[in-house]
Regions:
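Domain-level signal for Mg2+-assisted phosphodiester chemistry and nucleotide/NA-binding surfaces
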Residues: 2-131, 144-149, 198
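Nuclease catalytic cores that cleave nucleic-acid phosphodiester bonds
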Residues: 113-229
Length: 229
């Protein structure tokens, strides 16, 4: 009598906190001139490596969800110099728009965009704030590059949490991989694990708090470090 074993490939959803990914990616590869094409390709490769990290088990990609905000595109005046700044013309804005376009071209990538809220204020950069508090510099020593306009992401964490819950409750995947670095995901991760989903965290080599280990099923980073020449 012949016995046939039917192997069903498990499905994986990969959720990416875009702001976290970009911050860690630039730190890891030591790239001072961001390229949207290279960045999109690096993210794609990083995600694909997760599907094949187990020698005896391969996963089928359900979808990559990329969470971020549309870049700020209004005009503001620097309070130190009075200089007008058109944020739609900045390198950051142009990079973000180009990166989103590249990601839209990738197979099975879905953009989930929140809102970048205008804080309506300028803040002194942290390193300069420390210098001021220590008395190493005075306010008169500040330059226009020492302050930055205050932006706050809205709805990104909420979208990540809702998607984790929805995917888990609908039994759409067997595994969820979250590329992120904070603990805001813990309630959603708990729900996913209770629903039988294998929940992995990729912090891109960033240290995580010890208590987070009890809320995940594994920790794994795939992006390779590049040393500065």
């Amino acid at each position: 009598m012949s016995i046939f074993f039917i192997h069903t490939m498990k499905k994986t959803a990969i959720l990416v906190d875009g702001a976290f990914f970009l911050r860690r990616y630039r730190n890891i590869i030591k790239d001072t001139s961001p390229d949207p094409v290279k960045t999109a390709n690096a993210l794609w490769t990083m995600c694909m490596l997760h599907l094949y990290k187990e020698k005896n088990e391969k996963f089928n990609l359900y979808r990559i969800f990329y969470y971020d905000c549309l870049p700020y595109d209004k005009k503001q005046h620097n309070p130190l110099t009075g200089k007008a700044i058109d944020f739609s013309k900045t390198e950051t804005h142009q990079f973000q728009v180009a990166l989103f376009e590249e990601l839209r071209k990738k197979r099975k990538v879905a953009l989930r965009l929140g809102i970048l809220e205008d804080g309506n204020k300028w803040i002194i950069k942290p390193e300069k704030t420390k210098a001021l508090l220590k008395g190493n510099i005075t306010v008169k020593d500040l330059t226009e590059n020492d302050i930055q306009f205050d932006f706050k992401q809205k709805m990104v964490d909420m979208k990540i949490g809702i998607d984790i819950a929805s995917i888990a409750l609908k039994k759409q995947v067997d595994q969820i991989i979250l590329i992120a670095g904070d603990s805001d995901f813990v309630p959603a991760a708990k729900l996913a694990r209770r629903e039988g989903v294998d929940f992995l965290l990729d912090p891109m080599w960033n240290p995580i708090k010890p208590n987070l280990f009890e809320h995940i099923d594994g920790l794994y980073s795939t992006l390779k470090y590049k040393t500065r020449k």
